[in-house]
Curated annotation (Swiss-Prot):
<dbReference type="GO" id="GO:0044183">
    <property type="term" value="F:protein folding chaperone"/>
</dbReference>
<comment type="similarity">
    <text>Belongs to the GroES chaperonin family.</text>
</comment>
<comment type="subunit">
    <text>Heptamer of 7 subunits arranged in a ring. Interacts with the chaperonin GroEL.</text>
</comment>
<dbReference type="Pfam" id="PF00166">
    <property type="entry name" value="Cpn10"/>
</dbReference>
<keyword id="KW-0963">Cytoplasm</keyword>
<dbReference type="GO" id="GO:0051087">
    <property type="term" value="F:protein-folding chaperone binding"/>
</dbReference>
<dbReference type="GO" id="GO:0005524">
    <property type="term" value="F:ATP binding"/>
</dbReference>
<dbReference type="GO" id="GO:0005737">
    <property type="term" value="C:cytoplasm"/>
</dbReference>
<comment type="function">
    <text>Together with the chaperonin GroEL, plays an essential role in assisting protein folding. The GroEL-GroES system forms a nano-cage that allows encapsulation of the non-native substrate proteins and provides a physical environment optimized to promote and accelerate protein folding. GroES binds to the apical surface of the GroEL ring, thereby capping the opening of the GroEL channel.</text>
</comment>
<protein>
    <recommendedName>
        <fullName>Co-chaperonin GroES</fullName>
    </recommendedName>
</protein>
<dbReference type="InterPro" id="IPR018369">
    <property type="entry name" value="Chaprnonin_Cpn10_CS"/>
</dbReference>
<keyword id="KW-0143">Chaperone</keyword>
<dbReference type="GO" id="GO:0051085">
    <property type="term" value="P:chaperone cofactor-dependent protein refolding"/>
</dbReference>
<dbReference type="GO" id="GO:0051082">
    <property type="term" value="F:unfolded protein binding"/>
</dbReference>
<dbReference type="InterPro" id="IPR011032">
    <property type="entry name" value="GroES-like_sf"/>
</dbReference>
<dbReference type="InterPro" id="IPR020818">
    <property type="entry name" value="Chaperonin_GroES"/>
</dbReference>
<dbReference type="GO" id="GO:0046872">
    <property type="term" value="F:metal ion binding"/>
</dbReference>
Length: 97
């Protein structure tokens, strides 16, 4: 199944949460928590401005991004991957290599 986000929406596949603490302790269950990083799978055409023009998004397909855990809407699995749909404004940062 393919999904194309509209306007300023972004589809993100959440990355696996770290299973070890900084001290090397293996974390399980809720202690591991949910990752707040993900890979951008698809982006909309852009945000529609008050004057009717469309501003392209800053994030691109393939970017690794950081977002707040409470943001985004979970969607059914797409190609066996659970994805989130969120507005670009809910993304806090792009991880640069």
């Amino acid at each position: 199944m393919k999904i194309r986000p509209l306007h300023d929406r972004v589809i993100i596949k959440r990355k696996e949460a770290e299973s070890k603490s900084a001290g090397g302790i293996v974390l399980t269950g809720s202690a591991a928590g949910k990752s707040t990083r993900g890979k951008v799978l698809a982006v909309g055409n852009g945000r529609i401005l008050d004057n009717g023009e469309t501003k392209p998004l800053d994030v691109k397909i393939g970017d690794i991004v950081i977002f707040n855990d409470g943001y985004g809407v979970k969607v059914e699995k797409i190609d066996n991957d659970e994805v989130l749909i969120m507005s670009e404004s809910d993304i806090l940062a792009i991880v640069e290599k």
